[in-house]
Regions:
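Active-site PLP-lysine loop of aminotransferase-like
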Residues: 9
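Short, small-residue-biased leader/transition segments that mark boundaries at the very start
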Residues: 1-2
Length: 137
């Protein structure tokens, strides 16, 4: 068994990735909507954008069929906030995932590890959440 590198093991981020993928697909069918991503992390975080922001931007860009801008903010002690914004002339849709504690990453890694028991192959967090999978809680 092998788990391909994941930018983020939070179960919430894995769900968020699927939600923004569907939103991007729907907004791609409409005219007049732009998208961008804003991420905020603690001041000591070295990479900008983060791996999670890069993965989410790739998801949204893939759904829209065009690249999106990413804004990175490093301040305070924020564990991680990712906001995808679909912006139209008369309305705006904001989708947000906010990690309130770094334990979510460890918990997600444990869920993924339990899910991997007895499996062979290369997997991602999307596989852990696939419709035919049982995610341990």
């Amino acid at each position: 068994m092998l788990f391909r590198s994941a930018p983020n093991f939070s179960i919430g981020v894995a769900v968020f990735d699927r939600v923004v993928a569907e939103a991007a697909h729907l907004f791609a069918q409409l005219q007049g909507f732009d998208a961008h991503l804003i991420e905020t992390h603690h001041a000591a975080k070295k990479d900008a954008p983060s791996g999670t922001a890069g993965a989410l931007a790739k998801t949204v860009s893939g759904g829209l069929g065009r690249p999106i801008p990413v804004t990175s903010i490093r301040t305070g002690s924020v564990p991680g906030t990712h906001e995808v914004i679909f912006d139209g002339a008369f309305e705006q849709v904001r989708l947000v995932h906010e990690a309130r504690d770094r334990r979510v990453f460890a918990e997600g890694a444990l869920v993924a590890a339990r899910w991997l028991i007895g499996k062979r192959g290369v997997f991602t967090m999307r596989d852990v959440l696939s419709s035919d999978s049982e995610v341990a809680s």
